């Protein structure tokens, strides 16, 4: 009979004080699979209603910005995956999809009424003048798209349409 953390045939397991194997639960800082009882590694696990964490090769929850299987995710300090959130990480803004939690790339996202951002191929909110889908657009220093305002760009005072935000060349 065994108690505590044990490695058997290269797999990590945990046994309670009553010698029962931990399955589908956390113990000793690790999560143990509900079927096999093996410590879970390199996999997402559900930690609450629509709340997920990712366990690294050591079975520990990851935190911060993480590249996992070619996708970019963010995990809060408690290891819970960010979903449906605009977050700033190391001075760059990212938006994480409300369903998948993946960083949004190459698309516009409306954060609130009238507040739009565009996220590039790296998942970062763009700033300054951008040409997107053939239209000249402008994003302020915070990444918000400018609409219905004049902005100084390249020494010119430019107006950006109130509806779509495109530069109106003759106004």
Residue ranges, per PLM feature:
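Extracellular adhesion/carbohydrate-binding repeat motifs centered on closely spaced tryptophans
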Residues: 1-171
């Amino acid at each position: 009979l065994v108690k505590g953390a044990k490695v058997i045939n290269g797999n990590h397991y945990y046994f309670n004080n009553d010698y029962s194997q931990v399955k589908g639960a956390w113990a000793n800082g690790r999560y143990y699979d509900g079927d096999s009882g093996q410590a879970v590694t390199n996999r997402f696990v559900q930690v609450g209603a629509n709340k997920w964490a990712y366990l690294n090769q050591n079975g520990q929850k990851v935190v911060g910005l993480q590249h996992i299987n070619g996708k970019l995710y963010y995990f809060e300090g408690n290891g819970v995956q960010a979903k449906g959130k605009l977050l700033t990480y190391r001075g760059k803004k990212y938006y994480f999809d409300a369903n998948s939690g993946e960083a949004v790339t190459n698309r516009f996202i409306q954060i609130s009424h009238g507040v739009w951002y565009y996220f590039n191929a790296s998942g970062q909110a763009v700033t300054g003048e951008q040409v997107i889908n053939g239209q000249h657009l402008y994003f302020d220093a915070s990444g918000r798209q400018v609409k219905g305002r004049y902005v100084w760009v390249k020494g010119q005072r430019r107006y950006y349409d109130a509806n779509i935000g495109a530069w109106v060349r003759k106004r």
